[in-house]
Amino acid sequence: GRIMSKKNPITVSSWTLGDQCKFEDRVIAAKEAGYEGIGLRAETYVDALNEGLHDEDILAILDKHDMKVTEVEYIVQWCEEHRSYEQKYKEQMCFHMCELFNVGHINCGLMEDYSVEHTAQKLKELCQRAGKLVIGVEPMPYSGIPNMEKGWAVVKESGCDNAKLIMDTWHWVRANQPIDLEVIKDIPADKIVSI
């Protein structure tokens, strides 16, 4: 096999490849563009199943093109008191995908704006459901966790070893956020799961 970029593969986001292509076309496009891994959302995985593919077929396509799934996403609405069945199913699907593709973390976002205390408690509950998987909280400027400061406060207060942060530079650049590394100087490096 090919040696990936040190231990962290260069991954193309599921969103970059859209949602209007067949699974194998997604893999081929990523490979031809030079990526070492692809991200998959629960929805794009279900799309592959709806093409008539089974888990074994998906793994065979990845192997055929020397590609790996290196990112699983996207759990949302995890702070709601009464989560919908759709969100519960999606969460379980993400757990299954991590096991299937040997991915250690799940990207999670939160559009709703709650207090740090409430969000940290709900993150703790999500982390407990996730077991050994890492929950990567992704701050986005237009979300309920709009910056690294609130993200870190939530992750820290949750007290969970498997709660970490994701730093998505695309969101910051697109939202014209200041590039100031001071915002992460107090965050231990091992609490950032993905950049």
What is the role of each PLM region?
Residues N147-M148, Q177-I184:
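Histidine/acidic-residue-rich catalytic or RNA/ligand-binding cores of hydrolases
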Residues V46, H171-V173:
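Short gly/pro/ser/thr-enriched loop/turn and capping motifs at secondary-structure boundaries
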Residues L181-I195:
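Aromatic-lined glycan-binding groove of carbohydrate-active enzymes
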Residues G1-V103, C160-K164, D190:
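N-terminal pre-domain/capping segments
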